[in-house]
Amino acid sequence: MALAIGLCLGLGIPISLIIGAVIGYYFAGKYFKKQLKENPPITESQIRAMYQQMGRKPTEKQIKQIMATFKKNNK
Protein backbone atom coordinates (compact mmCIF):
# COMPACT_ATOMS: atom_id res chain seq x y z
CA MET A 1 0.00 0.00 0.00
CA ALA A 2 2.68 2.49 0.97
CA LEU A 3 4.70 1.46 -2.08
CA ALA A 4 1.76 2.22 -4.38
CA ILE A 5 1.27 5.67 -2.86
CA GLY A 6 4.98 6.42 -3.10
CA LEU A 7 5.05 5.24 -6.72
CA CYS A 8 2.05 7.40 -7.62
CA LEU A 9 3.62 10.46 -6.02
CA GLY A 10 7.04 9.69 -7.48
CA LEU A 11 5.66 9.52 -11.01
CA GLY A 12 2.74 11.93 -10.73
CA ILE A 13 4.62 14.98 -9.52
CA PRO A 14 7.36 15.01 -12.20
CA ILE A 15 4.86 14.26 -14.97
CA SER A 16 2.61 17.09 -13.73
CA LEU A 17 5.57 19.48 -13.65
CA ILE A 18 6.57 18.58 -17.21
CA ILE A 19 3.02 18.97 -18.52
CA GLY A 20 2.67 22.30 -16.69
CA ALA A 21 5.95 23.55 -18.16
CA VAL A 22 4.88 22.64 -21.71
CA ILE A 23 1.48 24.30 -21.33
CA GLY A 24 3.07 27.39 -19.73
CA TYR A 25 5.62 27.67 -22.54
CA TYR A 26 2.86 27.49 -25.17
CA PHE A 27 0.68 30.16 -23.57
CA ALA A 28 3.64 32.43 -22.82
CA GLY A 29 4.63 32.31 -26.51
CA LYS A 30 1.10 33.17 -27.62
CA TYR A 31 0.92 36.05 -25.13
CA PHE A 32 4.32 37.41 -26.22
CA LYS A 33 3.36 37.35 -29.91
CA LYS A 34 0.05 39.07 -29.12
CA GLN A 35 1.85 41.82 -27.21
CA LEU A 36 4.33 42.35 -30.06
CA LYS A 37 1.47 42.65 -32.53
CA GLU A 38 -0.43 45.15 -30.38
CA ASN A 39 2.66 47.11 -29.31
CA PRO A 40 5.29 46.97 -32.05
CA PRO A 41 8.88 47.63 -30.97
CA ILE A 42 9.00 50.78 -33.11
CA THR A 43 6.40 53.43 -33.91
CA GLU A 44 5.88 55.70 -36.89
CA SER A 45 7.10 58.70 -34.92
CA GLN A 46 10.32 56.85 -34.08
CA ILE A 47 10.85 56.10 -37.77
CA ARG A 48 10.30 59.78 -38.62
CA ALA A 49 12.81 60.81 -35.94
CA MET A 50 15.34 58.31 -37.28
CA TYR A 51 15.01 59.72 -40.81
CA GLN A 52 15.33 63.29 -39.50
CA GLN A 53 18.51 62.38 -37.63
CA MET A 54 19.91 61.14 -40.92
CA GLY A 55 19.00 64.48 -42.49
CA ARG A 56 16.20 63.13 -44.67
CA LYS A 57 12.49 63.87 -44.85
CA PRO A 58 10.60 60.58 -45.07
CA THR A 59 7.55 60.19 -47.27
CA GLU A 60 4.42 58.59 -45.88
CA LYS A 61 4.96 55.70 -48.29
CA GLN A 62 8.41 54.98 -46.83
CA ILE A 63 7.06 55.01 -43.28
CA LYS A 64 4.16 52.68 -44.15
CA GLN A 65 6.58 50.40 -46.00
CA ILE A 66 8.88 50.12 -42.97
CA MET A 67 5.92 49.47 -40.63
CA ALA A 68 4.62 46.76 -43.00
CA THR A 69 8.06 45.14 -42.98
CA PHE A 70 8.10 45.09 -39.16
CA LYS A 71 4.60 43.59 -39.02
CA LYS A 72 5.52 40.98 -41.63
CA ASN A 73 8.64 39.96 -39.70
CA ASN A 74 6.71 39.64 -36.42
CA LYS A 75 4.28 37.04 -37.78
Curated annotation (Swiss-Prot):
It is a single-pass membrane protein. The keyword Mitochondrion does not apply. It is found in: Membrane. One of its GO terms (cellular component) is membrane. Pfam families: UPF0154. It comes from the Bacteria. Keywords: Membrane, Transmembrane, Transmembrane helix. The chain crosses the membrane at residues 5-27. Belongs to the UPF0154 family. This is UPF0154 protein MYPE400.
